[in-house]
Amino acid sequence: GLSQSGCQAFTGRWCVGCERLRSRVVWECSPKRVVNSI
């Protein structure tokens, strides 16, 4: 997977990108978006 801005892709999933919003990381994963709190 790809890693940007301290982001890492989930194991077993393909993330096409990620963006850091305030205190959370938004993962652009197919087929849906997954949001993780940091």
UniProtKB/Swiss-Prot annotation:
One of its GO terms (cellular component) is extracellular region. The keyword Disulfide bond applies. Keywords: Disulfide bond, Secreted, Toxin. Expressed by the venom duct. The cysteine framework is XIV (C-C-C-C). This is Augerpeptide hhe53. GO terms for molecular function: toxin activity. The keyword Secreted applies. It is found in: Secreted. Contains 2 disulfide bonds.
